[in-house]
Curated annotation (Swiss-Prot):
Cofactor info, note text: Binds 1 divalent metal cation per subunit.
The EC number(s) this enzyme carries: 3.1.3.5
Enzyme class: hydrolase
Organism of derivation: Campylobacter jejuni subsp. jejuni serotype O:2 (strain ATCC 700819 / NCTC 11168)
Gene field: surE
Any one GO CC term of the record: cytoplasm
Protein's recorded name: 5'-nucleotidase SurE
Residues bound to a divalent metal cation: D9, D10, S42, N96
Length: 258
């Protein structure tokens, strides 16, 4: 029997997580464990908690919330505390409410859950559902169908990537999708705002907000294809070295020494 570990960054009560658990329980004969943050941890990136203890709080059969933990905490502690005899065959992070595309990947707690898994040697996928602000309820039907297909492929054929690589998968908001595209991550144009105010004690504070997020016009990027109605799959690697720039930096450093 396969073993699956699930986490997310929207918290243990999120709709996307509930829908994912229901589908996996119905479609796969697998031992499923869920460890999710006790509260929403969106945009927490790959942070881990080093300054205080964390505890598992059981909320169901093999279902735990991690008190004030991040997605990376959830995966790391689950692997080291809950899996004594055998590690999971797959870690799934999601389904996130909102896309994780372009450089958003570096901010994403959803993607960080998958990152932590592959750092620990476990194949992983990150799942995110794009939606429009006008939508009152998210339709996860397409996301669940595609996720089922991808997981079945992984179990039947093995994971398609090397070590320390994961699949970042995004689903479009449209009810009828055009298909699935393997593509590169796009490039965001960021514009963050810092709103200042004063609390009742007279102390100034700031509240960050993302405003007018846009993207560069790249025809075959995850962002562009997602907006056209395609589900996108982007292989992500954790090797951050800019190899093509190493010679340039070496020459630059040598020139500075002369």
């Amino acid at each position: 029997m396969k073993e699956i570990l699930i986490t997310n960054d929207d918290g243990y009560e999120s709709e996307g997580l509930k829908k994912l658990i229901k589908m996996l329980t119905k479609e796969f004969k697998a031992k499923i464990t869920i460890v999710a943050p006790a509260s929403e941890k969106s945009a927490c990136s790959h942070s881990i908690t080093l300054t205080k203890p964390l505890r598992f709080v059981k909320v169901g059969k093999r279902f735990y919330k991690l008190d004030d933990g991040t997605p990376a905490d959830c995966v790391y502690l689950a692997l080291h505390a809950l899996y004594k005899k055998r590690l999971p065959d797959l870690v799934i992070s999601g389904i996130n409410k909102g896309a994780n595309v372009g450089e958003d990947i570096t901010y994403s707690g959803t993607c960080a859950g998958a990152m932590e898994a592959v750092l620990q040697g476990i194949p992983a996928i990150a799942l995110s559902q794009f939606y429009k602000k006008s939508e009152k309820e998210l339709d996860y039907k397409n996301a669940l169908q595609i996720t089922k297909k991808i997981i079945q492929n992984i179990f039947d054929k093995g994971f398609p990537l090397e070590k320390k690589e994961f699949l970042n998968i995004n689903f479009p908001a449209k009810s009828k999708i055009k298909g699935i595209k393997i593509c590169k991550a796009g490039k965001r144009v960021y514009n963050f705002e810092a709103h200042s105010n004063v609390n009742p004690r007279g102390v100034e504070y700031y509240w960050l907000a993302a405003a007018n997020l846009d993207f560069e016009d790249e025809k075959n990027s995850d962002i562009a294809l997602l907006k056209k109605g395609y589900a996108t799959i982007t292989p992500i690697m954790l090797d951050l070295t800019a190899y093509e720039r190493m010679k340039k930096v070496k020459k630059w450093l040598k020139a500075n020494d002369e």
